[in-house]
C-alpha cells in the first residue's frame, strides 16, 4: 500500500515537472484558453442551430414566436377567450387594425420573447380549441345569454385554463414554443402572409450562421494549433538548451554517471515526448473540460431528462479505460529504458564496427542488437495491441449511447414531451461530453510516459557538477605556466582506493615533462587533473603559485592546449577545426600550426586545402591525420601549457621525431607535458616521471632513470636495444 502511494506521489511530482516547463509561456497559454472558449461556444452552438432548423425552420415554417405577425378580426377576438384581463389588455396593445387584419407592432426580439412567455398558455389553448371538430363550442362560449352570462362563461373558461395549464407545464419549453408557433403559422396563413417565404428566409439565415460558426471553428483551431506549437517548440528549445548547458558543464564524474547513449536519448526522444504532450495538453486537455462542462449545461437546458444515459456511458468508459491503463501502463514506463538500451547497443556497434569486423563478431553483435530490438518491439507491440482495443470499444459505447438516446427520445416524442430537433441536439451534446472524457483518458495514457521523460530530463538538469568555480575566484595575473603537484592523491567518485598516491612534481616552462608507465598506472588520470576534468582528493595543484581550484575554469583552460589520447575532430572544415581553440587565429597562424604538427603535406594535397570538409568525428581522414590535426589545433591556440596525452602513438617514428623537433623549436617558452608509451618519444625530455601503480617511482632525465629506476629500465629495454640505450651488453646482462 505504501509502495503504491509512493509511486502515485512520484507520478504526481513528475507531472508537475511537465507543467513547470509551461510556466514561462503563460501569455500564450492564456490566449490559447481564450480561443478554446470561443471554439467551444461555436461547437456548442451548432447543435442548437441544427435543432432550430428541424423544429423551427422545417416544422414551423421558420416562425419563431407564439404571437402571429397578422391575424383576422375574428381570430383576434377569439384569441382572448382564455386570457385574463391583464393579458387581454397586453394583447390589444401590441396589435393595430388594418382593415380586416390585425398586424403586430412589436419588432424587438426581447419584447417578443417576454410577450411569448405571457401569452403562450392562452394562445396554445385557443389553438387546441380551434382543432376541435365542434367549432360551435367557441361560438357558444363567446356569446353571453343573459346579464351575467358572459361573466359566468369567462369564469368557466379560466377554470378550464387552470386545469389545462398543469398539462402544458409538463411539456418542455421547446414543445410549448412549437405548439405556439403552429398557432402563429395558422393565423399568418389565414391573414394571407407567405409563410413559405418566411421559412426560406429562416433556413438561409440559419444556414449562413452555421457556415460562419464552422469558419470560426476552423480559424480558431488553426490559431490554437499555431500558439500551442509555438509553446511546444519553445519548451523543446529551452529544455535542449538547459540539458546542453548542463552536460557541457559536467565533469568526467557526471559523464561517467550518465552514459552517452542515455544523454542522447534524454536530449532527443525524451524532449520530443514532452514537446508533443505539451501541445496535446494545450489542444486537448485544456479543451476537454471546457467542452464537457458546456455540453452538460446545454443538456440541462434541453430539459430532456435523459442525463442518466450520459452518466452511465461515462462510467462505462472510465471503467474500460482504467482496465486498459492497468494493463498497458507498466509497459509504457519500461519503454523509455528499452529505447536507452537500443541506443546504447547501436552506438557501440556503429563506433566499434571495425573492431567487430576484425574479430569476426558480426553475427554475435547482430544477435545482441536483435535481443535489444526484440525487447523494444515486444513491448511496443504489447502496448499497441492493448491500445487497439480502445477505439473499437469507445465507438461501440458511443453507438450504444446514440441508440439509447434515440430509443428513449422516440418514446418522449411519441408522448409529446420532446421534439425531433431537441433529440438530435441531445445526441450531439452527449457525443461532445463523451468525447471530452475520451480526450482526457487518452491523455492519461500518454502523460505517464511523458512524466517519465520529464523526470529523466530533470535528473540531468538538477545534477550539479562536482567541479565548479570558487565563489571568490582569483584572477590570473601571471602567465608563466608553472604547474606544481603537491602531494596529490586521487580516487574516482564512489571508489574505495586511491588511483594516484602522493604525486609531487613541478613542470617548468621551457621544459618537457614526460610521464611514462605501464598501462593502467594512472598517467591519463594525472594529466586530466590539470584542466580539472576531475578534482584532486587530497593535496593541491597550482598554476603559477595559485591553486587551480581558486581559478575559474575558463581562465584555467585558456592557459591549456589539450590533446587527448583519441583525436577528436568536429564536422566542418580543416580550418574551422584548427581555429576551434582560437576563433580569431589568422590563416598564417593555422598554417604554421599545421606545419609544426607535420600536417601541411596532406592538407595541401587536398583540392580545397584548408577549406576541405571534415566529416562527423573526422571519419574521412586517417587516424594519423586526425591526430596531427588535433595536435595542430592545440598549437594554433598558442597556450602556455601543452598536454599531450599519449598523442604521438598514432604517428610513425619519422613523423613523431619531426613533430617533436618542430615542437621544441616553436614552443620554447611553454610548459610541455607528454604522456607517452614509447621511450623514443621522451628521450630528450628535461624531466621524466615514471608511474607504477599510481605512484611516482622515478624522476629525472633518461640517463638518470636508466641508472636509478628499475621500472624505467625494464620499459626501456623492452623497446630499445642496449646500443640504442647507450648501455654495454654486460650492463644489460648484469641488470637482468
What is each PLM-predicted segment?
Residues 11, 42-58, 213-256, 260, ...:
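Juxtamembrane helix-loop junctions of ABC transporter transmembrane domains
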Amino acid at each position: 500500500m505504501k509502495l503504491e502511494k509512493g509511486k502515485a506521489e512520484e507520478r504526481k511530482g513528475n507531472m508537475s515537472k511537465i507543467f513547470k516547463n509551461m510556466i514561462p509561456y503563460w501569455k500564450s497559454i492564456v490566449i490559447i484558453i481564450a480561443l478554446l472558449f470561443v471554439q467551444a461556444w461555436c461547437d456548442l452552438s451548432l447543435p442548437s442551430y441544427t435543432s432550430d432548423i428541424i423544429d423551427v425552420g422545417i416544422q414551423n415554417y421558420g416562425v419563431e414566436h407564439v404571437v402571429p405577425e397578422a391575424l383576422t378580426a375574428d381570430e383576434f377576438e377569439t384569441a382572448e377567450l382564455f386570457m385574463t384581463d391583464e393579458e387581454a389588455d397586453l394583447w390589444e396593445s401590441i396589435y393595430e387594425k388594418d382593415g380586416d387584419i390585425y398586424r403586430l407592432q412589436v419588432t424587438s426580439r426581447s419584447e417578443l420573447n417576454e410577450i411569448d412567455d405571457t401569452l403562450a398558455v392562452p394562445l396554445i389553448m385557443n389553438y387546441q380549441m380551434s382543432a376541435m371538430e365542434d367549432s360551435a363550442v367557441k361560438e357558444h362560449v363567446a356569446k353571453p345569454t343573459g346579464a351575467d352570462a358572459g361573466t359566468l362563461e369567462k369564469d368557466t373558461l379560466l377554470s378550464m385554463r387552470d386545469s389545462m395549464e398543469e398539462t402544458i407545464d409538463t411539456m418542455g419549453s421547446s414543445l410549448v414554443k412549437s405548439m405556439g408557433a403552429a398557432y402563429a403559422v395558422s393565423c399568418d396563413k389565414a391573414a394571407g402572409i407567405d409563410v413559405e417565404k418566411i421559412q426560406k428566409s429562416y433556413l438561409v439565415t440559419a444556414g449562413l450562421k452555421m457556415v460562419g460558426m464552422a469558419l470560426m471553428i476552423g480559424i480558431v483551431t488553426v490559431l490554437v494549433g499555431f500558439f500551442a506549437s509555438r509553446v511546444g517548440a519553445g519548451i523543446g528549445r529551452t529544455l535542449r538548451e538547459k540539458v546542453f548547458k548542463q552536460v557541457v558543464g559536467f565533469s568526467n564524474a557526471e559523464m561517467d554517471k550518465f552514459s552517452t547513449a542515455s544523454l542522447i536519448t534524454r536530449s532527443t526522444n525524451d524532449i520530443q515526448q514532452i514537446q508533443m504532450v505539451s501541445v496535446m495538453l494545450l489542444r486537448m486537455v485544456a479543451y476537454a473540460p471546457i467542452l464537457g462542462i458546456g455540453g452538460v449545461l446545454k443538456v440541462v437546458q434541453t430539459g430532456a431528462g435523459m442525463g442518466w444515459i450520459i452518466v452511465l456511458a461515462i462510467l462505462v468508459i472510465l471503467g474500460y479505460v482504467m482496465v486498459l491503463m492497468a494493463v498497458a501502463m507498466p509497459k509504457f514506463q519500461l519503454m523509455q529504458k528499452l529505447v536507452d538500451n537500443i541506443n546504447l547497443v547501436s552506438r557501440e556497434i556503429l563506433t566499434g564496427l571495425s573492431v567487430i569486423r576484425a574479430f569476426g563478431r558480426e553475427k554475435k553483435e547482430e544477435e545482441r542488437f536483435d535481443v535489444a530490438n526484440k525487447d523494444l518491439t515486444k513491448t511496443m507491440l504489447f502496448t499497441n495491441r492493448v491500445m487497439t482495443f480502445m477505439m473499437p470499444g469507445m465507438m461501440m459505447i458511443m453507438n450504444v449511447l446514440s441508440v439509447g438516446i434515440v430509443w428513449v427520445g422516440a418514446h418522449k416524442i411519441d408522448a409529446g414531451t420532446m421534439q425531433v430537433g431537441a433529440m438530435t441536439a441531445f445526441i450531439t451534446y452527449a457525443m461532445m461530453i463523451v468525447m471530452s472524457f475520451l480526450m482526457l483518458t487518452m491523455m492519461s495514457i500518454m502523460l505517464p510516459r511523458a512524466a517519465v521523460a520529464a523526470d529523466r530530463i530533470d535528473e540531468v538538469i538538477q545534477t550539479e557538477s562536482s567541479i565548479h568555480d570558487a565563489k571568490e575566484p582569483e584572477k590570473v595575473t601571471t602567465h608563466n605556466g608553472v604547474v606544481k603537484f603537491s602531494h596529490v592523491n586521487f580516487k574516482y567518485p564512489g571508489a574505495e582506493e586511491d588511483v594516484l598516491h602522493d604525486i609531487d612534481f613541478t613542470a617548468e616552462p621551457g621544459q618537457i615533462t614526460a610521464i611514462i608507465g605501464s598501462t593502467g598506472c594512472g598517467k591519463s588520470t594525472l594529466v586530466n587533473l590539470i584542466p580539472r576534468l576531475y578534482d584532486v582528493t587530497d593535496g593541491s595543484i597550482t598554476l603559477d603559485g595559485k591553486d587551480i581550484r581558486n581559478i575559474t575554469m575558463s581562465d584555467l583552460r585558456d592557459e591549456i592546449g589539450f590533446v587527448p589520447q583519441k583525436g577528436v575532430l568536429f564536422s566542418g572544415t580543416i580550418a574551422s577545426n584548427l581555429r576551434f581553440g582560437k576563433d580569431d587565429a589568422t590563416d598564417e597562424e593555422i598554417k604554421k600550426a599545421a606545419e609544426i604538427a607535420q600536417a601541411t603535406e596532406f592538407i595541401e594535397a587536398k583540392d580545397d586545402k584548408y577549406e576541405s570538409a571534415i566529416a562527423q568525428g573526422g571519419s574521412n581522414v586517417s587516424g594519423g591525420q586526425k591526430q596531427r590535426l588535433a595536435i595542430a589545433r592545440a598549437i594554433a591556440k598558442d597556450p602556455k601549457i601543452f598536454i599531450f596525452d599519449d598523442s604521438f602513438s598514432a604517428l610513425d617514428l619519422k613523423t613523431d621525431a619531426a613533430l617533436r623537433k618542430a615542437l621544441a623549436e616553436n614552443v620554447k617558452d611553454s610548459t610541455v607535458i607528454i604522456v607517452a608509451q614509447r621511450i623514443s618519444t621522451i628521450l630528450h625530455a628535461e624531466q621524466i616521471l615514471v608511474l607504477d601503480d599510481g605512484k611516482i617511482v622515478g624522476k629525472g632525465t633518461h640517463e638518470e632513470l636508466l641508472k636509478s629506476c628499475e621500472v624505467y629500465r625494464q620499459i626501456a629495454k623492452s623497446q630499445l636495444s642496449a646500443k640504442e640505450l647507450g648501455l654495454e651488453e654486460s650492463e644489460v646482462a648484469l641488470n637482468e
